Design a protein with these regions (language model features):
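Long, low-complexity, intrinsically disordered segments
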Residues: 307, 311-339
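A short interface-forming secondary-structure element
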Residues: 230, 234-247
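Short, structured loop/turn "capping" segments at alpha-beta junctions
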Residues: 167-172, 180-189, 223-224
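Short amphipathic alpha-helix segments
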Residues: 203-224, 252-256
């Protein structure tokens, strides 16, 4: 991809944003090489694109695979790395090995991000690279309870978007200039963000949440979460899609399918989808916006999405604004929710 993509005179992005993007790219270029903590969300994807421009083959995108990363997100990360043309590696670890993470206290994202970024540094050492960078952007530090950012600081992770003052809106503009398919992608917080603080994170809970959300995605919903309240599924649907969720056909199908996954009770949250509603600082509406799951985070951790989380990682310690459903095709409710 040509560096000229970022030139202000192309009209693709405002001059101020282009200048910030060039500053971030130049800062990356001063590194001997970088490993980008990569979730495939918009923040880490822009960092990866800038790093690829600046360093060529000395830039590597790395995604952390664990129980909290949906399989679909890993597949998407591989696809986006291919779009960018950057080498893509994966590392595997388990947050469930850490009792502090499993306990799911207010610092869960700190414990997760510390482990995740630690594996990134292991990968960097194996590759002979000294710098690990992430997708933290300039909006992230002011977004409420974000313990994952403490891990980024303690581990001396390079955050080129933050250092250049690039906001979330500017990240999306830069992604559009690069022609990235994730320019409008919301951050996808890690699956543990669906479990209320204080309730242990277990593989069983993570698995049933992932399967439940996969169903909603297959049924055509765009903005949603399934929160696991110890056997009670609280389904959150974006406000602009809530009317569809009130259809009796959906109610019957979601109750049947989620019960089969092991949920004892299935409820629809009439407040709709909002970011971080089970986190210590939860309760914001989806329309209010949030940085995300290193974006999406990771992150939750960022975005939920963090970026990040994290997963690669994104900066979001929880979820991020959901996309609109304006382009969703009309559906035959009788056929959409198969028995």
């Amino acid at each position: 991809m040509s560096n000229d993509t970022l030139a202000a005179e192309t009209g693709a992005i405002p001059p101020e944003t282009a200048a910030k993007a060039r500053a971030a790219r130049d800062a990356l270029g001063r590194c001997d090489g970088v490993v980008v903590a990569f979730s495939g969300g918009v923040d880490s994807s822009v960092v990866a694109a800038l790093a690829r421009d600046a360093l060529g083959d000395d830039a590597v995108a790395c995604t952390a695979r664990s129980e909290t990363l949906p399989a679909a997100e890993l597949d998407d990360a591989k696809r986006v790395a291919g779009e960018i043309g950057i080498r893509h590696e994966t590392v595997t670890f388990s947050e469930l090995d850490d009792p502090n993470f499993v306990a799911n206290d207010d610092d869960r994202c700190y414990h997760c991000r510390t482990m995740r970024l630690g594996r990134m540094y292991d990968a960097a050492r194996d590759l002979g690279i000294g710098t690990v960078c992430d997708g933290t952007n300039a909006d992230d530090p002011g977004e409420g309870h974000r313990p994952g950012l403490r891990a980024v600081d303690e581990l001396d992770v390079f955050s080129p978007l933050l250092d250049a003052g690039i906001t979330k809106a500017e990240v999306r503009r830069i992604a559009e200039a690069y022609g990235l398919s994730v320019a409008d992608k919301p951050s996808m917080a890690c699956l543990s963000s669906r479990i209320p603080t204080g309730l242990e994170v277990t593989e069983e809970r993570l698995t049933r949440v992932e399967k439940a959300e996969r169903l909603l995605r297959e049924w055509g919903f765009k903005g949603f979460r399934v929160r696991d309240h110890d056997g009670l599924a609280r389904v959150e649907i974006a406000p602009d899609e809530l009317e569809r969720a009130l259809d009796p056909a959906f109610a019957d199908a979601v109750h049947e399918h989620l019960s089969d996954l092991g949920f004892e009770y299935v409820t629809l949250d009439m407040a709709g989808y909002r970011m971080g509603s089970v986190s210590p600082a939860g309760g914001k509406t989806a329309s209010s916006g949030e940085a995300a799951s290193s974006e999406e985070a990771a992150s939750s951790e960022k975005s939920a999405g963090s970026e990040e989380a994290a997963r690669g990682t994104e900066t979001a310690d929880d979820d991020e604004t959901s996309p609109s459903n304006e382009d969703a095709p009309a559906v035959d409710l009788g056929r959409q929710y198969p028995r």
